[in-house]
Amino acid sequence: MAQSPQLKQSSPTSPDPQDFRLDATPAMRADNVVSGEHWRIGLITDSLVRFEWSDSGVFENRPTQTVLNRDFGSPVERRVTERDGRVIIDTAALTIVYDQQPFSKEGLSVVVKGVADTQFNTWHYGDAQRGNLKGTARTLDEADGAIELDNGVISRDGWAVIDDSAANIIIETDTVNGKANPFGTWVSPRATAETDLYFFGYGHRYIEAVRDFYRLTGPTPLLPRFAMGNWWSRYYRYTQDGYLALMDRFKREGIPFTTSVIDMDWHRVDDVDPKYGSGWTGYSWNRELFPDPPAFLADLHRRGLRTTLNVHPRDGVRAFEDAYPEVAKRVGIDPATEENVEFDLTNPDFVDAYFDMHHRMEAEGVDFWWLDWQQGGVTRQKGLDPLWMLNHMHYLDSGRGGNWPLTFSRYAGPGPPLPGRLLRRHDRDLGIARLPAAVHRHRFQHRVWLVEPRHRRPHVRLPQRRAGGPLVPARRVQPDQPTAFVQLAVLRQGAVELQP
């Protein structure tokens, strides 16, 4: 049986730019492009088309936050004709009609061939995607039943559209905003505005549509085996000894776990001076609860458990933090002033110091991070979502030096790594397990409050609420009363062990 790949322990090091390079083929094949002065139509496949309009006549050939590969390696057979000022492009799957003017509902349309069971297989620019079979949502906080989902790439009407116009581009650069960039690559706004759409006209060939979407946005990372197992997560003020005793009890009762999720009480929370704000963000161990963090993490490893710590990065690094003096100096702040080091992912000096702070804790035994970003989608850079940037940078950083990359976070749009969800209500009412693949979500993990044997989620994390929290009381597992909780944990672990 294949062994789970190892997550190597890291040490504080300067980033190797090679770890942040992207393996991408972003330029379209020249022989698959039909274009004019201000427009460009790229036939990536006979069913996947890129539509661009640029007032400046400058088009983007570099990778974006979403799209890495626009050259699939083969010419696309098509017939191109011009009639009455309109360009007509016929492929095996599509008929495109375009008036060579700024995109409009009247001037740009696509007919998807071979879709007999709908009257809506023709797309006009700007049409609402009423038949879209959806992807997922950024968060399930407070969800109770049906919620609005983002669009995916498959549809009952045979077509779907992804608008990449606002996405930043990924560039190789030695400097960012006049500062040295130790990462080699960076995310930058587009130099010129353009409309940049991807049209998926696969009819009901859903698997093919999703497969080509994965090719467009980059390959699916392979998860280490342990990540497929059961994770223990409870929002509760554990002590070091109490947590280890609980892990030992689970083992005695035959309840298998592979991963320990330590929620936010691993760091200082309640004793933070109000002058610094709340204790929601923190990077300093709570020594009253965890007096010897390296020993605690080593004890978890000896029990065969990987460890992830919950972090809410929004408030940056404040003067009460252990790492504050060094981080402040790195960004040009005199530590004596106790000025807050702002969380700013557009500043490479901060990002470099931020990751060094994490590397030191990884050297103590932290395996990976639970990035629990909840504060919206705005940074100092136009179009750059902080959650996306966190996911992107943490995932690449976790793979430095040949390590097996793994990051646990929320969904920030099509393509990022393993997302999590915080469920406040019964998971059975949400019905989302089958949806995320349409936005490159091949592994999804849910907190489950009500566990039933029929629930076979792609990922299941079995949490309990912090003492005093609302909605759901802690659920005790009695050794003489097997519950669905125990049954599901054992069932899932058996399934993991059977994987090749």
Give each language-model segment a name.
Residues 41, 152, 250, 300, ...:
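A residue-level signal for conserved active-site and pocket-lining positions in enzyme catalytic cores
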Residues 20-57:
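N-terminal-proximal low-complexity accessory segments that begin disordered
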Residues 12, 44-84:
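A low-complexity, Ser/Thr/Gly/Pro-enriched, surface-exposed linker/loop concept
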